[in-house]
Design a protein with these regions (language model features):
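Phosphate-handling DNA/RNA-contact segment within nucleic-acid enzymes
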Residues: 7, 49-151, 167-168
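Modules that initiate DNA replication and primer synthesis
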Residues: 140-187, 198
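Short, surface-exposed amphipathic charged segments that create phosphate/polyanion-binding patches used
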Residues: 60-62, 145-149, 193-208
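TOPRIM metal-binding catalytic domain and adjacent DNA-binding surface shared by DnaG-type primases
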Residues: 1-64, 102-106, 148, 179, ...
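RNase H-like polynucleotidyl transferase catalytic core
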Residues: 131-136, 182-192
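Active-site donor-binding loop signature of nucleotide-sugar glycosyltransferases
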Residues: 78, 188-190, 196
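A polyampholytic, Gly/Pro-enriched intrinsically disordered region
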Residues: 152-159, 201-214
């Protein structure tokens, strides 16, 4: 679905406004705690000190994660950083998109697919360009076409088994593998996600996991 260029312009301006408010904010501290502060400029991460035109007041004081494309910003995810729920929100009426699609556009033979924007940022900063599905229920069948022409797609979603025996991250991985013919699925340690692994074990842990495929 094509997005109105005026909306893209409005959201792009909002992303710059939020990014300008990042320094010294609670969101900056949060990014540091997740080991991705160095990517704040590259990914235009920000802080909603004041709500931009077109956004609801409920998004105030959140970390802003813009969905940046060649055309501009096509959407946002907002992350609550005070420990409350829900942790993530999107503006009312916003459509689902893949995050960090530039990783596909600029891919040289290989791209990772992960679960969540922070994991995509972490993997990319570690040297492995990654796109994110924005949650276990956010995959859309037409997204699969984005990976046409990519030689190797590595699926690396959360390994988050629940008390009832379900594992939403691994369920998502199976759906992705069914949808993307050239994909390869790798598994993280129980309870782990990409960002957690890199924070705990360093970028080399992801390199070892990915390079073990070869």
């Amino acid at each position: 679905m094509r997005i109105n260029p005026k909306l893209i312009e409005l959201w792009t301006k909002a992303s710059h406004q939020y990014h300008a408010s990042l320094a010294g904010s609670p969101a900056e501290e949060y990014l540091h705690s997740r080991g991705i502060l160095e990517g704040s400029q590259r990914f235009r991460l920000g802080y909603v000190a004041e709500v931009a035109p077109g956004h609801e007041d409920r998004l105030r004081y959140h970390l802003s994660i813009p969905y940046i494309t060649e055309a501009g910003v096509v959407g946002f995810k907002f992350r609550r950083i005070d420990g409350g729920e829900p942790r993530y929100m999107i503006p009312t009426g916003q459509k689902q998109h893949l995050y960090n699609v530039d990783a596909i556009i600029n891919a040289v033979g290989r791209v990772l697919v992960v679960e969540g924007e922070i994991d995509a940022i972490s993997a990319t900063l570690a040297g492995f360009p990654a796109v994110a599905v924005a949650g276990v229920n956010a995959w859309k069948p037409h997204f699969a076409r984005c990976f046409d022409g990519i030689g190797e797609v590595i699926i690396c979603t959360d390994n988050d088994a629940k008390e009832d025996g379900s594992n939403p991250g691994q369920d998502l991985a199976r759906r992705l593998q069914d949808a993307i013919p050239q994909s390869i699925r790798v598994s993280l340690s129980p309870g782990m996600d990409i960002n957690g692994m890199i924070c705990d074990q360093g970028a080399q842990a992801l390199a070892s996991l990915v390079n073990a495929i070869d």
